């Protein structure tokens, strides 16, 4: 069974709105074992929407549309669908009542054009919308299925989850299950080289590498009749990848590096502090994304100036004068200083040049020294990151967290 997504709306076509619905629906369809090879975006124009329907049904069994269910004249998805299937638009009394109740409850005046949203193609199944006024519909005709959903994600997603997914599950004879392998420390090309034979031999499961802003993710996907059967296909491939890539694999579930580090700190009952210069508090901010981090995170300091490094962390002025703020020596003193003054077992520190100005031939933009202190031992890593200011800060943050992870798992 093949599906195709059609996003309807001139605002999407012009780039005024990001089509996040397509990403969500693609992932959900894959999880249901429904193949999808095409997506379309079309403006609010009857002829072009009709053409999009023709194109989709020439290669797919199911069309899922989003958008064009509002009360205005350019919201024409249901009208075009009714014409396409040669059906009349009729009033759905339950939908009309719900629309009226929606406005009455909010003490707002309902204009006549809102009643347009209660019209559905004759014979269609109504999909209730508990978060807005536009119901969706399912049309089945001559072995064709069309599922029409509203554009706002806060309305579309619950409708898909509560009504469309169970409907599609009954029609699918298999499911897709995916697991992710998250990697730091080596690039996409190096990862691909390490597992080239696995990628070349893939059938079921499949292996798909993705380069992220920082790091690489592999998605392993298997198709089977049940989830357990799919997982049995995935597990040996996942284990082989972990064996080959070693400590570069930081997670085999969809979690971020800060959550991995937070879990390790809590598990080992190690307290942590941070002192950041070029990252400006980003490491601390990432860590406190994790609920429960307050058990171990005691303090975060942003020590941007030399004075702050000296006064708050106790970095020796002689070291600052001799080696400069951006140096291995300063990073070492920062790591020791924040751990000592905050009385923590662990610390992460950064000092560097994020740019776009401030670099020299000796110390270019992107140069960052990252220090990790763990119970008396300091590890320093010299890094040269590429990209704009925010990219440098992000790479330094992720690298610092990954340095600590690698130490804690030894």
UniProtKB/Swiss-Prot annotation:
Disulfide bonds: none annotated. CDD domains: cinA. Gene3D superfamilies: 3.30.70.2860, CinA-like, MoaB/Mog-like domain. It comes from the Bacteria. Belongs to the CinA family. PANTHER family: NICOTINAMIDE-NUCLEOTIDE AMIDOHYDROLASE PNCC, NMN AMIDOHYDROLASE-LIKE PROTEIN YFAY. This is Putative competence-damage inducible protein. It comes from Clostridium beijerinckii (strain ATCC 51743 / NCIMB 8052). The gene is cinA.
């Amino acid at each position: 069974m093949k599906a195709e997504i059609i996003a309807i709306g001139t605002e999407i076509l012009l780039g005024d709105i990001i089509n996040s619905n397509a990403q969500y629906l693609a992932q959900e369809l894959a999880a249901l074992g429904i193949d999808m090879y095409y997506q379309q975006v079309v403006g609010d124009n009857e002829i072009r929407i009709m053409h999009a329907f023709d194109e989709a049904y020439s290669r797919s069994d199911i069309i899922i549309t989003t958008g064009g269910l509002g009360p205005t004249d350019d919201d024409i998805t249901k009208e075009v669908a009714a014409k396409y299937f040669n059906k009349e638009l009729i009033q759905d009394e339950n939908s009309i009542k719900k629309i009226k109740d929606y406005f009455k409850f909010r003490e707002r005046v309902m204009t006549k054009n809102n009643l347009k949203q209660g019209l559905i193609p004759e014979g269609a199944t109504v999909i209730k919308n508990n978060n807005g006024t536009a119901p969706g519909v399912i049309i089945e005709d001559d072995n064709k299925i069309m599922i029409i959903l509203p554009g706002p994600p806060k309305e579309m997603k619950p409708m898909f989850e509560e009504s469309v997914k169970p409907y599609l599950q009954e029609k699918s004879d298999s499911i897709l299950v995916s697991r992710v392998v998250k990697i730091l420390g080596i690039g996409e090309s190096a990862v691909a080289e390490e597992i080239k034979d696995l990628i070349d031999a893939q059938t079921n499961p499949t292996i798909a590498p993705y380069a992220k802003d920082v790091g690489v993710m592999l998605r392993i996907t298997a198709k089977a009749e049940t989830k357990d059967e799919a997982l049995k296909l995935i597990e040996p491939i996942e284990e082989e990848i972990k064996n080959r890539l070693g400590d570069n694999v930081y997670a085999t579930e969809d979690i971020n590096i800060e959550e991995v580090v937070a879990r390790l700190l809590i598990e080992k009952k190690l307290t942590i502090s941070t002192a950041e210069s070029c990252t400006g508090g980003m490491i601390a901010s990432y860590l406190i994304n994790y609920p429960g981090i307050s058990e171990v995170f005691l303090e975060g300091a942003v020590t941007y100036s030399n004075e702050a490094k000296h006064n708050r962390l106790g970095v020796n002025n002689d070291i600052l004068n001799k080696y400069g703020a951006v140096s291995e020596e300063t990073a070492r003193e920062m790591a020791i200083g924040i751990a000592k003054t905050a009385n923590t077992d662990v610390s992460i520190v950064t000092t560097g040049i994020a740019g776009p100005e401030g670099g020299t031939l000796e110390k270019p933009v992107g140069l960052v020294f990252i220090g990790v202190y763990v119970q008396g031992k300091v590890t320093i890593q010299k890094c040269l990151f590429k990209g704009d200011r925010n990219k440098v800060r992000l790479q330094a943050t992720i690298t610092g967290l990954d340095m600590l992870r690698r130490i804690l798992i030894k």
